[in-house]
Amino acid sequence: MDGKRLYCAGGTAAARYAGEYLRHFYVDLAERPGGNVGAVLLDVPSFAPDGTLRMGGSVENLLAQLPPDVTVCGGNLDHPALDNYRCIDFLKDAQYQAENAYITAECAVEIALSYLPMTLRQCPVLVIGWGRIGKCLGQILHALGADLTVAARKDADRAMCRGLGYAAVDTARMVETLGKYRLILNTAPERLLTKEQLAQCHPDCVKIDLASKTGMEGDSVIVARGLPGVHMPESSGRLIVETYVRLCREE
């Protein structure tokens, strides 16, 4: 960044770990915002639902303390105050998304184990969706011996699941067998299972929704978003730093 310093403006545990890891990469850090800052690193994601920074305060106040040519790094940076700034959005980087998906999957398994009254070995599990997180969940759960079924829309995806040793079901027909599962993990960001449909589940079925938009309806559903920063902040912080260093080197 033209010899200027990086200012870490995050307020989460992941951001604190990121600050520690940045020193391992010999990144020149600024202790406070000022004219010597070439880039600012926000939390990932960077904003709360009300548009304020997750660290607290407004992004406008933060930017007022920084040079007009500062580079803003973070996640979900589609904020109107940033329209005239150069932004590096980690959540649009494919490598970051892939590595973050694995951390998310591991966090989800940790949550599931804290609620299940049984081990994952031979536990009937349904994973809904065959995206990045769904694939990572499949690998982990299969390795732990779960009786795994993946719900996917595409014939090719279901064929891949069967080739990997998982059972597969068309998403449109998964409701027919809901009663057999003791753990359901949704990764699809759309409403797929209603409260009435979920009433068919086993009384002790653990239902965890990982999607950005809720896919399962009902009070019994555990809505789990932003897991890496909450459950594994060190791994999340390290990934943020590795992504920052990599993207800067690619410029």
Named regions from a protein language model:
Residues 12, 76-78, 153-155, 211-213:
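Residues in the short beta-alpha loop(s) of Rossmann-like NAD(P)-binding domains
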Residues 23-27, 37-39, 70-71, 82-95, ...:
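Active-site regions of enzymes building and remodeling cell-envelope glycoconjugates
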Residues 1-82, 87, 243-251:
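N-terminal ligand-binding/catalytic initiation module
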Residues 6-22, 121-142:
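Glycine-rich adenosine-cofactor-binding loop
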Residues 45-54, 58-69, 162-232:
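Rossmann-like adenosine-cofactor binding region
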Residues 24-31, 144-164:
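NAD(P)-binding Rossmann-fold cofactor-contacting core
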Residues 43, 55, 89-93, 102-104, ...:
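Conserved mixed alpha/beta catalytic, RNA-binding, or beta-rich assembly cores of soluble enzyme
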Residues 86-122, 216-251:
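Adenosine-phosphate binding glycine-rich loop
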